[in-house]
């Protein structure tokens, strides 16, 4: 009996420790991809992206190891009120060696407080670095609405017919503003802070199975005292977004229309750019001028077509029209059908086409890319991960223009601008060619 009594306090302590550990369990989430590939003409795997396009079709066309590791925890809860701490560290290396050192990117560190305001039930207050309500097309890894960065906001305010969210975030550009030093010399090393103010109204039910989201983003350069912007800089701009999401065929379809002005045109996703400068091959500074407008019309989704077939798809038209004539018209269309042989094995094909017209030259670059992959994945959905795939990719392109980065901006008036492929006897763009690659890759999110 004495032995039993002696063991009882220890058992209680262990049980309490286990319960405490469970109550304070850390959430571990993330994303990663890595693999190995070869090019048909020799050497390591090459990846194919059309000059002037802001993304590429990614299946069998990713040449790096990339990972995001997220740790988070609900650190306090009382009734329906809670605080959650979230972090995210990202890594990217060229996957060419065993030991590849890199500096990590600290992408998220924020606290989210839910139901803290009595008269706004269901809302969340947050502050810190955060991936904020990002909208993307997975199959081309294209983020068309993404203001992520250090910031603060109040989201998911129930207004009866939808959810209202308010946020402010920041992104900085190197060398964007200057101060007078001496002898008529200006120092362009100071970073320029770009602030973005975001308002969204989401989850508005406008038809059976369909919701509407509307958003307005205003971005502007925020200068320090006694500093001035680079001549010709794009100091502010607007982005307007309307997105309709429809439930269809056990999946979804998203139709998006976006219009942007000036500093919000180049990235086209809600972050301001153009108040900074770039540096040429000789480290001379030249301004980035994004004044103009952007129109984007996008349709994408993922659907199920019976027990054995799933498919992703995308179609997009984007027109960036700049006052300096260095804009582009880009349209892209692609599909990724998946046939499921078993609940964990499938064959996936991706077919994508890009066409980019230079505003300055009127010439066009185009590329089509086809990938066939045999895949083993954790489930029978096109979204199931982890997945291990072996693939073969073929790409053919014909490029009639490219960007001129020869020399420096002081002696080359075309530096950083679009020029014809044979401009001044040179060779710009990728020419007219084709190539194929093959390899294996894993991809996981959890």
Curated annotation (Swiss-Prot):
Family statement drawn from the similarity comment of this UniProt entry: Belongs to the porin LamB (TC 1.B.3) family.
Protein name from the UniProt record: Maltoporin
Alphabetized UniProt keyword annotations: Cell outer membrane, Ion transport, Membrane, Porin, Signal, Sugar transport, Transmembrane, Transmembrane beta strand, Transport
Site (Greasy slide, important in sugar transport): 31, 66, 99, 252, 383, 445
Induction, per UniProt: By maltose.
CDD domains assigned: Maltoporin-like
HAMAP family noted in UniProt: LamB
GO molecular function: maltodextrin transmembrane transporter activity; maltose transporting porin activity
Signal peptide segment: 1-25
InterPro entries: G_neg_Bact_CarbUptk_Porin, Maltoporin, Porin_LamB, Porin_LamB_sf
Assembly with partners or alone: Homotrimer formed of three 18-stranded antiparallel beta-barrels, containing three independent channels.
Job of this protein: Involved in the transport of maltose and maltodextrins.
GO BP, sorted A to Z: monoatomic ion transport
Alphabetized NCBIfam families for the sequence: PRK09360.1 (NF006860)
Gene3D superfamilies linked to this entry: Porin, LamB type
Reactions performed catalytically: beta-maltose(in) = beta-maltose(out)
Membrane topology: Multi-pass membrane protein
Annotated site (Important in sugar transport): 143
Subcellular localization: Cell outer membrane
UniProt xrefs under Pfam families: LamB
Native species: Escherichia coli (strain SE11)
UniProt GO cellular component terms: cell outer membrane; pore complex
């Amino acid at each position: 009996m004495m032995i039993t009594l002696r063991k009882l306090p220890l058992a209680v302590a262990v049980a309490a420790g286990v319960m405490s550990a469970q109550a304070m369990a850390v959430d571990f989430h993330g994303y990663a991809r890595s693999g190995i590939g070869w090019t048909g003409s020799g050497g390591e795997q090459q990846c194919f992206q059309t000059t002037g396009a802001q993304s590429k079709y990614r299946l069998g066309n990713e040449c790096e190891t990339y990972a995001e590791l997220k740790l988070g925890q609900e650190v306090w809860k009382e009734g329906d009120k809670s605080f959650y701490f979230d972090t995210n560290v990202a890594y990217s290396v060229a996957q060419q060696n065993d030991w590849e050192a890199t500096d990590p990117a600290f992408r998220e560190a924020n606290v989210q407080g839910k139901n803290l305001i009595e008269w706004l039930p269901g809302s969340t207050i947050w502050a810190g670095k955060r991936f904020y309500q990002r909208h993307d097309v997975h199959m081309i890894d294209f983020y068309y609405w993404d203001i992520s960065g250090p910031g603060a906001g109040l989201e998911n305010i129930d207004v009866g017919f939808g959810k209202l969210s308010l946020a402010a975030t920041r992104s900085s550009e190197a060398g964007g503003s200057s101060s007078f030093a001496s002898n008529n010399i200006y120092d362009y090393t100071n970073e320029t802070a770009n602030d973005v103010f975001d308002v969204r109204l989401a989850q508005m039910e406008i038809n059976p199975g369909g919701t509407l989201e509307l958003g307005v983003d205003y971005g502007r350069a925020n200068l320090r005292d006694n500093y001035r912007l680079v001549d010709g800089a794009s100091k502010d701009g607007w982005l307007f977004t309307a997105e309709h999401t429809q439930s269809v065929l056990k999946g979804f379809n998203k139709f998006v229309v976006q219009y942007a002005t000036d500093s919000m045109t180049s990235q086209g996703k809600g972050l301001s750019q153009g108040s900074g400068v770039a540096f040429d091959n000789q480290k001379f500074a030249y301004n980035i001028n994004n004044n103009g407008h952007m129109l984007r019309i996008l349709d994408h989704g993922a659907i199920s077509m019976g027990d054995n077939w799933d498919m992703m798809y995308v179609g997009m038209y984007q027109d960036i029209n700049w006052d300096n004539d260095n804009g582009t018209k880009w349209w892209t269309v692609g599909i990724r059908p998946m046939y499921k042989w078993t609940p964990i094995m499938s064959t996936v094909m991706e077919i994508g086409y890009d066409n980019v017209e230079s505003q300055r030259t009127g010439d066009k670059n185009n590329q089509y890319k086809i990938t066939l992959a045999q895949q083993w994945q954790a489930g029978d959905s096109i979204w199931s991960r982890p997945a291990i795939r072996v693939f073969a990719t073929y790409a053919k392109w014909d490029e009639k223009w490219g960007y001129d980065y020869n020399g420096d901006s002081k002696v080359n008036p075309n530096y950083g601008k679009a020029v014809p492929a044979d401009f001044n006897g040179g060779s710009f763009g990728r020419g007219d060619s084709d190539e194929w690659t093959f390899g294996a890759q894993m991809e996981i999110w959890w």
